[in-house]
Amino acid sequence: MTLENNMDKKLFCISTYGCQMNEEDSEKLSGMLKSQGYERTENKEEASIIIFNTCCVRENAENKVFGNLGQLKQLKKKNPNLVIAICGCMMQQVGMADKVLKTFPYVDIIFGTHNAHKFPEYLHRVLQEGVQVKEILNKEEGIVEGLPIDRKSDVKAFVTIMYGCNNFCTYCIVPYVRGRERSRKSEDIIKEIEELVSQGYKEITLLGQNVNSYGKGLEEDIDFAGLLRKVNEVKGLERVRFMTSHPKDLSDDVIMAIKECDKLCEQVHLPVQSGSSRILKEMNRHYDREYYLDLVKKIKSEIPDVTLTTDIIIGFPGETEEDFLDTLSLCEEVGYDSAFTFIYSRRNHTPADKMENQIPDDIKHDRFNRLVEAINKKVVIKNKEYEGKVVEVLVEGPSKNDETKLTGRTRNGKLVNFAGDEKLVGELVNLKIVRAQPFSLIGEIVE
């Protein structure tokens, strides 16, 4: 399907909300448009196509989308040929697409999480027939391979290995909007990684809602540990990361693969969500506090230099002060290198939304602030331990905060900023850490 647009400049702008899975979906949307002659811009004023790729994990993300959609009304009035598309998880929710069209009738295209590959077709219909397109598929179809991808980085890339989730945690809407678990064939994954390496990529991150479930439903006999060992054999690849792991499915085989495979980075993102066994049961997480702490001990004993990061939800329905203190003490015991902390957000059609004992906002915010303070104190102490050490860093590009500096990450995920020549981008360099900051390290090149 070719896209036709009479405008001299064929520019598009994509705003992405949410997780790395959404980021990779946006890279595919961008790739499809670029393959049709469009160029990307960050300036909505000059774009002929504006896409919002949405998230619905928290209410805050939805409110941002509504606010930004409202701001496009004047742009559409100024430029009636502007095409506005909205897609992603938020649109997959029951009734959301109709709500958006009723509130923002100037939106041209709406689609969900299962049919992003059909975007060129929808765009063609809007441009050629002047119609409004809304198509939300209620059931996931097969995995579409071979879509063009416009990567954000020339050094590291996301590679999705599976889609969907079967876990149904009581607070989470993801299984309802992303569908059931589907794994890509390992040969397709390896082929994509080999192509990336041939283009000069040094690091890949394997993505999935729960990567440890990889392989279920495939004809070939392979699990996640087996896939990791296959990926480790790709010549020219320097580093491999993965996310996200569900603690209940992180097997001994995966731990041993991280230990034994030289390209697998010593970093595990292991969402705990709560340190209270009672709350974990209410969340339907299928593990308790003791199981999680035993798993952490096992990981640390097999992989001594490992960094552990996590996700934590504060203010889940029924959470008492005692439950919260359990979370604080677990964080102290584990000693996370960083944590993504969230205030519980009610989501329609999830079991937790119907639970009694919803926590008042002021208590949620107080606990959230106490947790962040406790975690940050620990992170500062852990970062201090790097001062004077020499670490290997993959140089990713200019630092976001200071473009005169370069930035990169250690094998175990620590962010390091340093002065150096831009020719080093994409290279592995040894840096001596001269100063630790709360959320990053400052290094100097070791000659």
Swiss-Prot record:
It comes from the Bacteria. Its cofactor is [4Fe-4S] cluster. This is tRNA-2-methylthio-N(6)-dimethylallyladenosine synthase. Residues 151-382 form the Radical SAM core domain. Its EC number is 2.8.4.3. Catalyzes the methylthiolation of N6-(dimethylallyl)adenosine (i(6)A), leading to the formation of 2-methylthio-N6-(dimethylallyl)adenosine (ms(2)i(6)A) at position 37 in tRNAs that read codons beginning with uridine. InterPro entries: Elp3/MiaA/NifB-like_rSAM (IPR006638), Methylthiotransferase (IPR005839), Methylthiotransferase_CS (IPR020612), Methylthiotransferase_N (IPR013848), Methylthiotransferase_N_sf (IPR038135), MiaB_methiolase (IPR006463), rSAM (IPR007197), rSAM_horseshoe (IPR023404). It comes from Clostridium perfringens (strain 13 / Type A). Binds 2 [4Fe-4S] clusters. One cluster is coordinated with 3 cysteines and an exchangeable S-adenosyl-L-methionine. It catalyses: N(6)-dimethylallyladenosine(37) in tRNA + (sulfur carrier)-SH + AH2 + 2 S-adenosyl-L-methionine = 2-methylsulfanyl-N(6)-dimethylallyladenosine(37) in tRNA + (sulfur carrier)-H + 5'-deoxyadenosine + L-methionine + A + S-adenosyl-L-homocysteine + 2 H(+). Belongs to the methylthiotransferase family. MiaB subfamily. [4Fe-4S] cluster 1 binds at C19, C55, C89. [4Fe-4S] cluster 2 binds at C165, C169, C172. The gene is miaB. Keywords: 4Fe-4S, Cytoplasm, Iron, Iron-sulfur, Metal-binding, S-adenosyl-L-methionine, Transferase, tRNA processing. Gene3D superfamilies: Methylthiotransferase, N-terminal domain, tm_1862 like domain. HAMAP family: tRNA_metthiotr_MiaB. One of its GO terms (cellular component) is cytosol. The keyword Endoplasmic reticulum does not apply.
